[in-house]
From Swiss-Prot:
Single GO biological process annotation from the record: negative regulation of DNA-templated transcription
InterPro entries, alphabetized: ATP-cone_dom (IPR005144), NrdR-like_N (IPR055173), RNR_NrdR-like (IPR003796)
UniProt domain ATP-cone: residue ranges: 49-139
Family affiliation: Belongs to the NrdR family.
Official protein name in the record: Transcriptional repressor NrdR
NCBIfam families (alphabetical): transcriptional regulator NrdR
Cofactor dependency: Zn(2+)
Free-text comment on the cofactor: Binds 1 zinc ion.
GO molecular function, one term: DNA binding
Zn-finger (unnamed) residues: 3-34
Keywords linked to the UniProt accession: ATP-binding, DNA-binding, Metal-binding, Nucleotide-binding, Repressor, Transcription, Transcription regulation, Zinc, Zinc-finger
Keyword hit for Transport: no
Length: 149
């Protein structure tokens, strides 16, 4: 690790501890040249799979797009940002756990609907109506009937 003060290449670790619920390591370091101290954080780089769109094109996973879709679905509903962040985290964890380099967009959409169903039924119907491209009232009725089972 290079010293951010003098650019020396030799630093020593003085203290290490787990932070962020064990997902990161915080290290206190000291430069052996200038004796300045600084802190570094180390965490695993988790790569999200690429998304295969319905038209066959592929694009990188876009967390902002996922969050935007969820925020639109829960707009003006009694759902906290913590609940939204937890749901998004579950979706990302599930996608990473597949171990696949690419996942179909249908999988992402279905995971989103699962999370919305447990968060807020109205938000689920909102998202499903757009995602499944409902064309008439009967399709809304079918989705609502599915919720009542």
């Amino acid at each position: 690790m290079h010293c951010p003060f003098c650019s020396a290449t030799d630093t020593k670790v003085i203290d290490s501890r787990l932070v962020a619920e064990g997902h990161q390591v915080r290290r206190r370091r000291e430069c052996t040249e200038c004796h300045e101290r600084f802190t570094t954080f180390e965490g695993a780089e988790l790569v999200m799979p690429r998304v295969i769109k319905r038209d066959g094109s592929r694009q990188p996973f876009d967390e902002e797009k996922l969050q935007g879709g969820m925020l639109r679905a829960v707009e003006k509903r009694p759902v906290s940002m913590d609940e939204i962040e937890q749901a998004l985290s579950k979706i990302k964890s599930t996608l990473r756990a597949t171990g696949e380099r690419e996942v179909p967009s249908e999988m992402v959409g279905n995971l989103m609907m699962e999370q919305l169903m447990s968060l807020d039924k109205v938000a689920y119907i909102r998202f499903a109506s757009v995602y499944r491209a409902f064309e008439d009232v009967s399709e809304f009725g079918e989705a609502i009937a599915k919720l009542q089972k």
